[in-house]
UniProtKB/Swiss-Prot annotation:
Disulfide bonds join 34-41, 45-53, 54-69. Belongs to the conotoxin K superfamily. The lineage of its organism: Eukaryota, Metazoa, Spiralia, Lophotrochozoa, Mollusca. Its main location: secreted. It comes from Conus imperialis (Imperial cone). Keywords: Cleavage on pair of basic residues, Disulfide bond, Neurotoxin, Secreted, Signal, Toxin. One of its GO terms (cellular component) is extracellular region. This is Conotoxin Im23.3. It comes from the Eukaryota. It is found in: Secreted.
Length: 70
């Protein structure tokens, strides 16, 4: 019984985390001021207090700024 409750809680946490990151990506694609360049999109990402902005910029199809990302 405890194992089932633990598993259920784990699944809920994972689904919530996946949903939150997906919402951020959807939001950036929907909002036109993410930027015209990778540097602008990176700055927008940082202003939103998102993490992994280098990966985010790549995901939306832009090149992240070389001085900020490796």
């Amino acid at each position: 019984m405890i194992m089932r409750m633990t598993l259920t809680l784990f699944v809920l946490v994972v689904m919530t985390a996946a949903s939150a990151s997906g919402d951020a990506l959807t939001e950036a694609k929907r909002i036109p001021y993410c930027g015209q360049t990778g540097a602008e999109c990176y700055s927008w990402c940082k202003e939103q207090h998102l993490i992994r902005c280098c990966d985010f910029v790549k995901y939306v199809g832009m090149n992240p700024p070389a001085d900020k990302c490796r």
